[in-house]
Amino acid sequence: MKIELASSYGFCFGVKRAIKIAENAGDAATIGPLIHNNEEINRLATNFNVKTLHGINELKDEKKAIIRTHGITKSDLAELKKTDIKVIDATCPFVTKPQQICEDMSNAGYDVVIFGDENHPEVKGVKSYASGKVYVVLDESELEGVKFRQKVALVSQTTRKVEKFMQIANYLMLRVKEVRVFNTICNATFENQEAVKNLAKRADVMIVIGGKNSSNTKQLYLISKNFCEDSYLIESEHEVEKSWFEGKNLCGISAGASTPDWIIQKVVDAIEKF
């Protein structure tokens, strides 16, 4: 059986940047998981003493606090800056962008629509920058019956599917006088999604590696599943099962933006042993 990696996969710019920041900081606490990958979080804790807190209320004797790649809410950031703790911002620049757009458009009198998961930390952070009306949706049907003002701004969670984002944009344009559409889906997300789609079309079995709580990894898995029925989402090599590969000729592999190369290689090694 041949194993083929997607043409684009794994660590994105924002994650690489955040990990380097955490490694350089050392002896610090992150506000929420730095990235959505438990294996890498454990490595940072073991090798660099970077521990994970659930919120700013858990800060006690820490001298350094790292803001996670997904960002935090505007109010939490303000509270954090009131303390004597050194604040190290590892928010991905692609996440900072919709935060700023949300704040600017809201202040300019626009209603704001965010395409994303309202329970995701990135979306919670972006939403907190709106001073006026803001709506978080995963589907245009959720906007039915909403009475917008004359002006609406649309942004997206950075890891969502472009096709769905455009459906929501089209829905708004048919119903609102002025719509400002800001494509805040990051390039790495788009490239990884296109790559997994192209590989899944040819593969007999697909393995998508990443955190089960990772939005971008889930999107990759769903795209893969759409084109290759035998698609599996795993976090580590320990979940790989021999039966998945019986009678298969091509195994495709993709990985989420928070998945390091060392985890991917362990999965490849495990599959090659079958």
UniProtKB/Swiss-Prot annotation:
One biological process term in Gene Ontology: terpenoid biosynthetic process
Active site per UniProt: E122
Annotated binding of (2E)-4-hydroxy-3-methylbut-2-enyl diphosphate, by residue: H36, H70, H120, T158, S214, S215, N216, S258
Residues reported in the UniProt entry to bind [4Fe-4S] cluster: C12, C92, C186
Species of provenance: Campylobacter curvus (strain 525.92)
Function: Catalyzes the conversion of 1-hydroxy-2-methyl-2-(E)-butenyl 4-diphosphate (HMBPP) into a mixture of isopentenyl diphosphate (IPP) and dimethylallyl diphosphate (DMAPP). Acts in the terminal step of the DOXP/MEP pathway for isoprenoid precursor biosynthesis.
InterPro entries (UniProt xref): LytB/IspH
Family, per entry: Belongs to the IspH family.
Sequence positions that bind dimethylallyl diphosphate: H36, H70, H120, S214, S215, N216, S258
Keywords, alphabetical: 4Fe-4S, Iron, Iron-sulfur, Isoprene biosynthesis, Metal-binding, Oxidoreductase
Binding site for isopentenyl diphosphate: H36, H70, H120, S214, S215, N216, S258
Coiled coil residues, start to end: none
Stated name of the protein: 4-hydroxy-3-methylbut-2-enyl diphosphate reductase
EC number: 1.17.7.4
Catalyzed chemical reaction(s): isopentenyl diphosphate + 2 oxidized [2Fe-2S]-[ferredoxin] + H2O = (2E)-4-hydroxy-3-methylbut-2-enyl diphosphate + 2 reduced [2Fe-2S]-[ferredoxin] + 2 H(+); dimethylallyl diphosphate + 2 oxidized [2Fe-2S]-[ferredoxin] + H2O = (2E)-4-hydroxy-3-methylbut-2-enyl diphosphate + 2 reduced [2Fe-2S]-[ferredoxin] + 2 H(+)
Any one Pfam family match given in the protein's UniProt record, by short name: LYTB
Pathway field: Isoprenoid biosynthesis; dimethylallyl diphosphate biosynthesis; dimethylallyl diphosphate from (2E)-4-hydroxy-3-methylbutenyl diphosphate: step 1/1; Isoprenoid biosynthesis; isopentenyl diphosphate biosynthesis via DXP pathway; isopentenyl diphosphate from 1-deoxy-D-xylulose 5-phosphate: step 6/6
Cofactor binding, per record: Binds 1 [4Fe-4S] cluster per subunit.
Single annotated GO MF: 4-hydroxy-3-methylbut-2-enyl diphosphate reductase activity
Annotated Gene3D superfamilies: 3.40.50.11270, 4-hydroxy-3-methylbut-2-enyl diphosphate reductase, catalytic domain
Enzyme class of the recorded protein, top EC level: oxidoreductase
The protein's required cofactors: [4Fe-4S] cluster
